[in-house]
Amino acid sequence: MIQIDGMAITRGDAQHGFRVALPSLTLEKGEIGALTGLSGSGKSTLLEMIGLILRPDELTHFQLGDDLIITQAVLSNEQAQLASLRAEKLGFMLQSGGLLPFLTVMQNIQLPRKMLGLTPHSAWLDHAIDHLQLRPLLSRFPRQLSIGERQRAAFIRAIAHEPALLLADEPTAALDPHNAQALYALIVEMVKQLDISALVVSHDWSLVERFGFSHYHAQLQGDGSVFIKQ
């Protein structure tokens, strides 16, 4: 599970800064949350803070997992500890997929496990590869895949090491409506199977509502935005 309270950052200088704030967010195991809002409202900025990439200016509480409190490590910007947490506890899925072009699909998928010293294969991973119909594509390179195939491969890579939290930045942005719905259905199924949490940035409110994601929407307030649970 993940619990965050009092997270905020101001981008820009003091006179023309834009403040992005998250008063509270809680996601249980098996639960998916969505960050929505207008372009420029700070969705990606917030995801970078939650992903331990961007240091917040303010933070009251940050719990990652059942009993791992990382508030002080985040505020102190302890890079070695944060890098270890990112590698072990978080999985990232980018708009473009983010697959390394010089690695095959299988090598891309196995990369997070190898970096953590895990065996490259697991029974669960083999099941997921078959379930997402990626087995015939494992020896191909990303350039040889369709957009939908790349996103499926990127999703499996993001959760191959069974992280506590999956973070996905507009994972359906390049997909047509049919493939977008299919990808979200796969994310829902796999998140429940792994009993992890997930947080997605999405511009598609209809899909967020259709799948019943917990919904945190950016409300513009003065010189900034506040993400409030709907």
Regions found by a protein language model. Give the residues of each.
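ABC ATPase NBD coupling module
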Residues: 69-91
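Short coil-to-helix segment of the ABC ATPase nucleotide-binding domain corresponding to the Q-loop/switch region
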Residues: 103-110
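Conserved ABC ATPase "signature" region
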Residues: 121-137
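Conserved ABC ATPase signature
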Residues: 141-151
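Hydrophobic anchor residue at the start of the ABC signature
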Residues: 155
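Conserved catalytic motifs of ABC-family nucleotide-binding domains
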Residues: 162
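Catalytic Walker B motif of ABC-type/P-loop ATPase nucleotide-binding domains
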Residues: 166-169
